[in-house]
Amino acid sequence: MGDSIHGRDLMSDRTTRRQVVQAGAGLALTATLAGCGLGEGPSGGDTTQRITPKVDGDLVYFNWAQYLNPSLFKEFENRHGVTVRESNFDSMPAMMAKLQSGNHYDLIFPSAEFTHKLVGADRLLEIPRDKLEHADVVYSYFDDPWYDPDSAHTVPYSLYVTGLGYRADKIDSMTGSWRDLTNPDAEGRSYILDDYQEGIGMANLVNGFDLNAVDPDQLEVSKEYLIGLKPDLRGFTSDTITSMASGNAWIQHLWNGDVVNIRYRVDNPDDIQFQKCREGLPVGSDCFAIPVDAQHPGTALLFIDFMLEKAAQNVKWTGYPMPTKNS
C-alpha cells in the first residue's frame, strides 16, 4: 500500500463512484478532455436516428462499480427477458479511452463535463423524451442543462457533493473545515480522493480561491498546499467504502453517497459521519447516455425508463439522490 501522497492505497474491491463534476472546470480538466482525442475516434452512426424503448438485444452496461442497485438488474432481466452485461471503469478518462478505442457499449454514465465533450463530438444518440413513459418524474431544472442543450442526449442519473467522512468512534472533534484532513486525532489515517480534480478543487477552496481556479499562481499555491499535507496523510484512494468500513481510514475525502454504503458495512452506523466543509463543496451530477455506436439502443432506452420508474429503490441502495420527483 502506498503511504505517500504520491502513491495510491489499493483495495480489493473495484473502484466506486466517481469523478467530480464542476460547471466551468479548470485547465486541468480541459487538458484531460483534449487528451481523449474524440475527434480522431472511430466513426459512429447517425446521432439523430429515432430510437424507441424496446428490446433489441442484451444490455451492454458501462458504469462505475457499485453505482446502481444490483437487484434492479435482475428485475429488469426478468421483466424483459434480457441479460445485463456489466463492465466497469475507474475514472472518466478511462471511460473515454474505452469509447475511443472502439469498444461498444449500450449505456454509459458520463459526468456533466464529459457529457458536454461527448455531445460536442457527436458521440451520443439523441434520447426521445416523448418515448419515455416516466420522463415526467425528472425535475424541470434538467430540461435544458448547460452540458446538453435541451437535454437532447441525456437523462440525469445522480447528484452528489464532496466532503469529509469521518469515524466518530475514533475522532473526538471536527471543526467543519477541509483543514480537518490534518486533525491530529486521525494519527495519519487521513485519505484524499484519488481524483486530481477533487484534490485541486479542495485545495483551491481551502486557500480561498474559486473551486475552478485557473490562475497559474493560485494553482501553484494549491499544489504546494497538497504537497504540504504529505506528512499527515496515509495516501490517496478511490475505494472510500472499503477504506472507511475496514477502519483503515479515520478521515476520508469522499462523495456523500458513499457514506450510506459505508454505514451498511459497519456494526454501528452512527460511527460514520459526513461533514460539509464551510469553505465550499463541489457539487456534481452524472447522466444516462447512449453512445452513437450502441448495438442495442432500444434496450438501453428501455432500461433508462425502467430506472426512472425505480428511482426510489435505487437511491435507497446507492445513497446518491436522483433528480426525480419519485425518489
Residue spans for each PLM region:
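N-terminal secretory signal peptides
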Residues: 1-15, 26-33
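Short helix-loop capping/hinge motifs at secondary-structure junctions, enriched
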Residues: 170-176, 208-214, 294-300
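Early extracytoplasmic/lumenal segment of secretory-pathway proteins
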Residues: 46, 50-117
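Mature extracytoplasmic/periplasmic domains
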Residues: 286, 291-327
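Bacterial signal peptide processing site
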Residues: 37-39
